[in-house]
Amino acid sequence: MSNCSNQDCHSAKDIKFLEIKHLNGPNIWTYRPTLEATVDIGELEDYPSDKIPGFYERLSQWLPSLIEHRCSYEERGGFLRRVQEGTWPCHILEHVTLELQNLAGMKGGFGRARETSVRGVYKVALSAWHAEITTAALHSARELVLAAMNFQQSSNPSYDVEGAINHLRDLVDSLWLGPSTACIVDAAIAHNIPATRLI
């Protein structure tokens, strides 16, 4: 017999951020600004995506643009194929964060999820041209992924994707570079010329 009530057992299936750091410059992941999150998935280590009923369907319905993520298969739909075959929450968190940033108007591009020596604890690294925006996208991605897992067994699980994207768009509009400055910065970065916002 289990030692916890149904609700307690489900609440143990969580994604917790132990630490979030903004690495503003060359780092162990890349030469560009990066957000590095230390993430504890606890019991979710035992729940790859293919073992969660309805997860793939909800995720691909809520974020259909994930079809463009190539992932390790190096082909359109590669990431969603990984989700169907079974991948872990931090890998999914990485891709969902990048896609939410992209849909909000701040392209990301780089992402990695790597195990640490502690079971269930991962490092997730993401392109972070603006730390506050990427951090907000990471938190929204966590909420979306947990809602798609539906461990509360809701008869109609949902997540306000449009609301999350609109919130991130507001942050991009108020904190990120305007279109002309962004083009200049993009060109500088393409030529390995560092750029830092001075506000």
Model-identified regions with their sequence ranges:
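Preference for protein termini
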Residues: 1-199
